[in-house]
Amino acid sequence: WIMGHMVNAIGQIDEFVNLGANSIETDVSFDSNANPEYTYHGIPCDCGRNCKKWENFNDFLKGLRSATTPGDSKYKEKLVLVVFDLKTGSLYDNQANDAGKKLAKNLLQHYWNNGNNGGRAYIVLSIPDLNHYPLIKGFTDTLKQEGHPELLDKLGYDFSGNDAIGDVANACKKAGVSGHVWQSDGITNCLLRGLTRVREAVANRDSGKGYINKVYYWTVDKRASTRDALDAGVDGIMTNYPDVITDVLNEAAYKSKFRVATYDDNPWETFKK
């Protein structure tokens, strides 16, 4: 999965997919009542990027729905996975469940079209703080209460705080999550980060008894670091330059080992070599 980083304006969806992304990451900010408000990152952000592009959250969802609904004039067949980077740092811990409920209602209405031929992309809820694990239950309970448990098949989970793997496993357990887990690891492109924890996550994924199904690394903009991440065995690479990742995947050393995921590739299944 080539994951376009910080795609917060509707116009950027096309831009990143046209460069080779089959997945995007979108920032979600919340108001003081735990309502998802904007798709917005703000300053500081990655080096070389405009940090200030934004939409109202529900407007972005409608644009995303168009891009992921077959038959729509804006449909992009390649776009199959969306990571919502939930900026819950502005919330109190006791608002996490509420944030999950409100997020679910917004997605249900504006993205999934109340279950009536809505967007088809798989969705990952990415949470930066392990203490905010109740967001997941708020979200999943709401889908069930609203009569759409089938949409849980489209939903995955990530804790993005680079916490110890054992601590993340615990948070998943507390959230009632077993399966559909993407584990992120990374740092802003302005800084360097080694692959120690990525390798640990990959080992957990491949052990057959870990909690992780997929591992992705962020934010990778250079060919050398792309090769290092692929050599470490990641499933996804988040990038500001999808064309760079595409180029590396076309190199002889990687062409036979990796391919770009399509809609038919289940993002919750651990890949067996």
Swiss-Prot record:
S-S bridge residues: 45-51, 47-190
Binding site for Mg(2+): 25, 27, 85
Active site: 5, 41 (nucleophile)
Cofactor note: Binds 1 Mg(2+) ion per subunit.
Major enzyme class: lyase
Example GO molecular function: toxin activity
Tissues where this protein is expressed: Expressed by the venom gland.
GO biological process terms on file: killing of cells of another organism; lipid catabolic process
Entry keyword set: Cytolysis, Dermonecrotic toxin, Disulfide bond, Hemolysis, Lipid degradation, Lipid metabolism, Lyase, Magnesium, Metal-binding, Secreted, Toxin
Superkingdom, taxonomy of origin: Eukaryota
Cofactors, names only: Mg(2+)
Subcellular localization, as worded in the UniProt entry: Secreted
EC number: 4.6.1.-
Record GO cellular component, one term: extracellular region
Catalytic activity from the UniProt record: an N-(acyl)-sphingosylphosphocholine = an N-(acyl)-sphingosyl-1,3-cyclic phosphate + choline; an N-(acyl)-sphingosylphosphoethanolamine = an N-(acyl)-sphingosyl-1,3-cyclic phosphate + ethanolamine; a 1-acyl-sn-glycero-3-phosphocholine = a 1-acyl-sn-glycero-2,3-cyclic phosphate + choline; a 1-acyl-sn-glycero-3-phosphoethanolamine = a 1-acyl-sn-glycero-2,3-cyclic phosphate + ethanolamine
Pfam families named among the record's database cross-references: GDPD_2
Matching InterPro entries: PLC-like_Pdiesterase_TIM-brl
Record family assignment: Belongs to the arthropod phospholipase D family. Class II subfamily.
Function recorded in the entry: Dermonecrotic toxins cleave the phosphodiester linkage between the phosphate and headgroup of certain phospholipids (sphingolipid and lysolipid substrates), forming an alcohol (often choline) and a cyclic phosphate. This toxin acts on sphingomyelin (SM). It may also act on ceramide phosphoethanolamine (CPE), lysophosphatidylcholine (LPC) and lysophosphatidylethanolamine (LPE), but not on lysophosphatidylserine (LPS), and lysophosphatidylglycerol (LPG). It acts by transphosphatidylation, releasing exclusively cyclic phosphate products as second products.
Protein name stated in the entry: Dermonecrotic toxin LspaSicTox-alphaIA1ii
Organism: Loxosceles spadicea (Recluse spider)
Lineage: Eukaryota, Metazoa, Ecdysozoa, Arthropoda, Chelicerata
